[in-house]
Amino acid sequence: MEDPEKKLNQKSDGKPRKVRFKISSSYSGRVLKQVFEDGQELESPKEEYPHSFLQESLETMDGVYGSGEVPRPQMCSPKLTAQRISVFREGNAYTLAGGQPRFNDYKANDHKPLPIIDFGKIIIYTNNLKIIRTPMDKRDFVRKILQKEEEAEEESLMNKEESYGGRDQHDRPLVEAESTLPQNRYTQEGDIPEDSCFHCRGSGSATCSLCHGSKFSMLANRFKESYRALRCPACNENGLQPCQICNQ
C-alpha cells in the first residue's frame, strides 16, 4: 500500500504548487523548510545538511510542525503569503528578521487597511517657513515714492524757513526777491502794465522750460529713490530761470 504523502506528491508533480511560506538560512541561503498552499511541507533531508540547527528547534515551536504531523486548521496571516522569512540565531534562541510576527501570533489588528491617497492634491514638504508677500502694484510703488518725495520737500522747506527766519528780508537772494515782489505787486493792484513781458509778467523769471518747475533732471530714473539727487541744471533751487524774452 502506497504512502499517502507519495500520492499527494505524484498528483502535484504535473502542476506547480503555490508556496505559502519558506524558511531559508541567513548564512548559506538554502531553503530549510517550505510549506505549500495546500498544507504540505517540503523539508530538506537531515542527512544532506547534518549541521542544520532548525530541525529540533522548529519541531518544538507552536504552530510549526514536522514532516510527520498534520497541520491543524487556523487563521493564517496574509502578511506571510508570498514573503520570505529570514531566521537568525542568537545563542540558543531563534528570531525572525525585522520583528515579523510568528505564525500563531496573528491578530485582527495586524492587518490594517492602507491609507487612502487623495489624488488631485499637491503636498509641499519644506523645512523653512517664510512669508510670501504679494508683489507691489506699479501705482502703489509710484505713490510711495511721491509720498517720500513730498515729505523730503516739506522738511527742506521747514529747514529753509528756520534758517531764513532770523534774517532780514533784504538779505534774501536776488532771484527770490525778483520772483515774488513785482508779481505780487501787480496781482494786488489787478493791472498789468502794457510794456511788461507776457511770458514772465514783468518779474524777469519764468518757470523752467526743461523740468517745468519740478527741479528734477530728465535723466532721472523715476522708479528708484536715487533720482532725487539728480537736479535740473537749467533752473535754480526754486525751479525758475531767467526769462529768455526779456533778456533778448
Swiss-Prot record:
It is found in: Cell projection, Stereocilium. Residues 1-16, 157-172 have a biased composition (Basic and acidic residues). Keywords: Cell projection, Deafness, Hearing, Non-syndromic deafness. This is Glutaredoxin domain-containing cysteine-rich protein 2. Disulfide bonds: none annotated. One of its GO terms (cellular component) is stereocilium base. InterPro entries: GRXCR2, HSP_DnaJ_Cys-rich_dom_sf. It comes from the Eukaryota. The gene is GRXCR2. Belongs to the GRXCR2 family. Residues 1-20, 150-172 are annotated as: Disordered. GO terms for biological process: auditory receptor cell stereocilium organization; protein localization to organelle; sensory perception of sound. Interacts with TPRN; the interaction restricts TPRN to the stereocilum basal region.
